[in-house]
């Protein structure tokens, strides 16, 4: 019987927003197991490493050069019959590494019902009929926009950023302020519903702005950011609501305008939470959540779909009407968007791992398609033994050297190596590196689908 451990060859996309040449983690990881004709070009952007069975960029078994999709469909036991049946013989998740040099589009991913409708109506722009909730884990310091800000912050920016108020329209801005005044933090369901309707009206008005008005407002906005960064987006008599990082916001606006001159995204910025993630920090985005990534290297895991509804910071197809109609208009502080990891209980660490403060952390979003475990083994000989799972896993090494064992099969692991581990198989990883403790950390991320305890999360709910 085949040992369910496959080393994978994974493709990398070269979108314009990717980090260039060897600066790109996605490129470095791809090069670790690349075809012989692949070399990293010094001036080419490398954006996304894809690990999975999605047909747009399918992973291959290094040994046989067969696609992973072929292999899991030929042998249902690799994913387990239950997972294979539930997800049509395809891996339920798409695992990625993103290397971001400049902003990705302001976007959201449709829920299952909308995805089916969009795919039927416009399969060229919406190639999948699946939803796409996704989780982001920072490898390097990350900047992004995620979800609508608390309403009080939006009200502040409407007053403090004159070009924003001009672009939306004074009357529309005033109507919003009047609608939410005194109810910005309400927990009453009916009032919250009214707040969301008001936010939808305001945001839709912004997104439907005429291009000549956007251009004029953008010039004024950037001029303000350049001339007075310390008081940017601030009011004289509003110490409680003024941003604590005015100069940082000004510099980001200037940077975004250099990347996408006079773009509507410069104004969407004031509606969305600005987030920084340090390595190991994470956030989870439900389907229909608005977001944009600005910079950094990240691990990303999502339901297997490539659907994106875009409306800013992009030269690609923009679908403003669909975006403004599909959003939930939920609003919350950024801390509520972050996902806190917990100790993963199904790993056994050996003595060398325990004594070196090695750990396995679980990032477990409230959906059935995937979870991710980050394991850091901080000493030579440190070992982690993972209990068998009832579904498939994909593991990538992002630092250090080690080995991976499943059954009687053992493979060496280096930075960028990617492996598929089949269902119901015990998996052992071990640090085989050398050097001091700080330098000698063997780090892996493992995405997996285990339906145990998640049977009720039908369709991600």
Swiss-Prot record:
Record flagged with keyword Cell membrane: no
Swiss-Prot/TrEMBL catalytic activity: D-mannose 6-phosphate = D-fructose 6-phosphate
Disulphide bond pairs: none
Enzyme Commission number(s): 5.3.1.8
One of the GO biological process terms: protein glycosylation
Residues binding Zn(2+): 107, 109, 134, 291
Pathway where this protein functions: Nucleotide-sugar biosynthesis; GDP-alpha-D-mannose biosynthesis; alpha-D-mannose 1-phosphate from D-fructose 6-phosphate: step 1/2
NCBIfam families given in the database record: manA
Family the UniProt entry places it in: Belongs to the mannose-6-phosphate isomerase type 1 family.
Chain's role: Involved in the synthesis of the GDP-mannose and dolichol-phosphate-mannose required for a number of critical mannosyl transfer reactions.
Protein name (database record): Mannose-6-phosphate isomerase
């Amino acid at each position: 019987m085949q040992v369910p451990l496959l080393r994978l060859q994974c493709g990398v996309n070269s979108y314009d927003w990717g980090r260039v040449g060897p600066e790109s983690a996605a490129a470095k990881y791809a090069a670790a197991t690349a075809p012989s004709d692949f070399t990293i070009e010094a001036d080419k952007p490398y954006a996304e490493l894809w690990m999975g069975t999605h047909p747009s960029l399918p992973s291959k078994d290094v040994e046989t050069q067969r696609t992973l999709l072929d292999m899991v469909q030929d042998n249902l036991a690799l994913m387990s019959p239950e997972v294979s049946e539930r997800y049509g013989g395809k891996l339920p998740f798409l695992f990625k590494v993103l290397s971001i040099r400049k902003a990705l589009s302001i976007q959201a991913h449709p829920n299952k019902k909308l995805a089916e409708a969009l795919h039927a109506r416009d399969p060229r722009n919406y190639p999948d009929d699946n939803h796409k909730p996704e989780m982001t884990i920072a490898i390097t310091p990350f900047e992004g926009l995620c979800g609508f800000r608390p309403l009080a912050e939006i009200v502040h920016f409407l007053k403090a950023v004159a070009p924003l108020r001009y672009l939306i329209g004074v009357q529309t801005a005033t109507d919003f302020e009047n609608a939410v005044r005194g109810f910005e933090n309400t927990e009453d369901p009916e009032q919250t519903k009214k707040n969301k309707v008001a936010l939808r009206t305001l945001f839709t008005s912004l997104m439907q702005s005429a291009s000549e008005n956007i251009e004029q407002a953008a010039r004024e906005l950037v001029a303000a950011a350049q001339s007075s960064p310390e008081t940017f987006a601030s009011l004289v008599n509003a110490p409680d609501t003024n941003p604590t990082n005015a100069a940082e916001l000004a510099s980001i606006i200037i940077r975004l305008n250099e990347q996408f001159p006079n773009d509507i995204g410069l104004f969407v910025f004031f509606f969305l939470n600005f987030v920084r993630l340090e390595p190991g920090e994470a956030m989870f985005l439900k389907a229909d959540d608005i977001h944009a990534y600005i910079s950094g290297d990240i691990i990303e895991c999502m339901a297997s779909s490539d659907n994106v509804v875009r409306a800013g910071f992009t030269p690609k197809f923009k679908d403003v009407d669909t975006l403004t109609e599909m959003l939930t208009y939920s609003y919350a502080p950024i801390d509520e968007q972050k996902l806190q990891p917990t100790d993963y209980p199904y790993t056994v660490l050996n003595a060398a791992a325990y004594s070196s403060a090695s750990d396995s952390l679980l990032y477990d979003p409230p959906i059935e398609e995937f979870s991710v475990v980050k394991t850091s083994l901080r000493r030579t000989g440190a070992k982690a033994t993972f209990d068998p799972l009832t579904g498939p896993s994909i593991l990538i090494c992002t630092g250090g050297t080690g080995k991976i064992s499943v059954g009687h099969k053992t493979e060496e692991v280096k930075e960028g190596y990617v492996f598929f581990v089949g269902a119901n198989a015990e998996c052992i990883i071990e640090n085989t590196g050398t050097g001091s403790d700080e330098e000698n950390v063997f780090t892996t991320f493992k995405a997996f689908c285990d339906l145990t305890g998640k049977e009720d999360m039908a369709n991600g709910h």
